[in-house]
């Protein structure tokens, strides 16, 4: 089934992270999802091979659209965690020569239809991400408004696509990848 991920993010301080952790733990049970991720980025594709260490799972995620976009067409394929290195080699063999490796510490919360993730990642540092997955493009605007309202209630300003693009380009430059 085709799905569309609608997502907003915000960079936060360690103090904000800790405060949000306490707040979200009162609203829902958090699920730890620490991972080692290999990200292959182009201007039109975001391919991630993710070894979800704490869940003993792994997956390949392909997002059509640039990493900075707030809504993308997303497809996932579950793989055996033992096959993560093979998946990275396969994607590299397809012409994606460089990738960004990162370690991510993540706690996910499900609040109604919103999945909220508090994260600390190698390149993004502390940040919060909130997403809604919809099955038709017509539902994207409503989902985006719900996410904006969620961030507003938290007192956090989500990043714009341009702010996200600037951050991603600085990360891409660090790893010798062309800017998008």
Where are these regions (language model features)?
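Mixed-charge, glycine-accented linear interaction segment located at domain edges/termini
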Residues: 136-167
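Conserved, surface-exposed functional patches that form binding/active-site neighborhoods
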Residues: 97-140
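Short, low-complexity, polar/charged sequence segments that are solvent-exposed and flexible
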Residues: 27-30, 79-82, 128, 135-138, ...
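N-terminal strand-loop-strand beta-hairpin
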Residues: 1-113, 157-180
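A short, polar/proline- and glycine-enriched secondary-structure boundary/capping micro-motif
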Residues: 69-74, 129, 140-141
């Amino acid at each position: 089934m085709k799905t569309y991920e609608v997502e907003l993010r915000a960079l936060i301080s360690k103090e904000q992270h800790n405060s949000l952790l306490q707040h979200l733990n009162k609203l829902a049970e958090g699920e730890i999802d620490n991972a080692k991720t290999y990200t292959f980025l182009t201007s039109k594709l975001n391919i991630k091979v993710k070894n979800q260490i704490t869940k003993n799972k792994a997956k390949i995620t392909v997002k059509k659209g640039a990493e900075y976009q707030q809504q993308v067409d997303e497809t996932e394929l579950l793989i055996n965690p033992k096959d993560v290195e093979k998946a990275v080699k396969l994607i590299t063999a397809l012409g994606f020569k460089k990738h960004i490796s990162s370690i991510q510490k993540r706690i996910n919360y499900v609040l109604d239809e919103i999945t909220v993730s508090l994260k600390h990642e190698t390149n993004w540092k502390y940040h919060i991400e909130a997403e809604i997955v919809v099955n038709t493009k017509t539902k994207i605007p409503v989902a985006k408004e719900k996410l904006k309202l969620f961030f507003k209630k938290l007192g956090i300003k989500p990043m714009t696509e341009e702010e996200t693009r600037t951050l991603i380009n600085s990360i891409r430059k660090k790893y010798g990848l062309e800017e998008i």
